[in-house]
Regions:
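Active-site rim elements
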Residues: 2-8, 74-78, 118-121
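Short, contiguous alpha-helical
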Residues: 8-22, 27-69, 105-153
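Helix-adjacent hinge/juxtasegments
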Residues: 56-96
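Acidic catalytic patch
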Residues: 92-107
């Protein structure tokens, strides 16, 4: 298995888990564990925007962080994630090798495409983990991630 196939496999699996976590965010929740922390819906939207930015960067050769405004509802966030996720595998597979193996412009510096992809996948997993620490405090449950949770043994 080559690195890109491995990445696509991991991305697909992690996006399923991410979707399960995002679906647990209660509609209308403004919970944040600290005034410096962001609410879960805002973190969820960052995940959506990071995924969009990454695939577009790999397609065009240039990363531009210009997230769309935060949707008013969690349902809108989930709908956007579902729509984007449905097209991601095809988009990963259609990337020219030169984009995956080449460099991308990222905030004024050049970064290897594959390294950037893995880095963003890990960042998305990190933000997903942040959300899981909010879920019970918001009155929700934590889904299985890499194995059972206290809520889903």
């Amino acid at each position: 298995m080559n690195e890109r196939t491995l990445f696509t496999t991991f991305w697909t699996n992690e996006s399923t888990t991410t979707r399960n976590v995002l679906a647990r965010i209660p509609e209308g929740s403004t919970y944040r564990p600290d005034p410096k922390s962001r609410p879960a819906q805002e973190i969820a939207w960052q995940i959506v925007c990071e995924e969009k930015m990454l695939i577009e960067a790999l397609e065009t050769g240039r990363a531009e962080w210009a997230p769309s405004p935060l949707p008013a509802t969690m349902k809108e966030v989930l709908d956007a994630y579902d729509e984007q996720r449905a097209r991601m595998a095809r988009r990963w597979n259609e990337l020219p090798d030169a984009r995956w193996d080449g460099t991308l412009e990222f905030f004024g510096s050049q970064r290897p495409g594959s390294t950037m992809a893995w880095g963003f996948l890990f960042d998305i997993v990190h933000h997903r983990g942040q959300i899981t620490t909010y879920l019970r405090a918001m009155g929700s449950t934590v889904p299985q991630i890499y194995g059972p949770s206290a809520d889903e043994p």
